[in-house]
Amino acid sequence: MGDIPSWIGTQVGDRVGRNVGTVCDVYYDEASSQPAWLLVNTRERLVLVPADGALSWSVRVIVPHDRDVIDAAPAPAAPPAVLAGEPLLRLARHYGVRVDRCAGCAAVHGPARAAQAA
């Protein structure tokens, strides 16, 4: 996946390369310390996108989801400091991903910095 924290501020493309937005934070699985979710500013709102399968390609991060799926994702009212519980389950259902590897995920920079990026 490359150096995930350096992805903050990087453009995000969907699985076919269409622009989605910019990474404004990375959420790590608290149990494994692995990146689990990317907080992306789409210019319209902040959305969380699974980090699994994301690849660094040139100066972009490419995620394995269509832009339409990302645009339709449930969005937090404000960036959470920790992603867990029902919000995590709603996102997992939306993207069709398993969440057993991420019982709780903490943001690298936290909600204040991510909110500034919005």
Q: What residue spans do the PLM features occupy?
A:
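Peripheral interaction segments used for macromolecular assembly
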Residues: 1-118
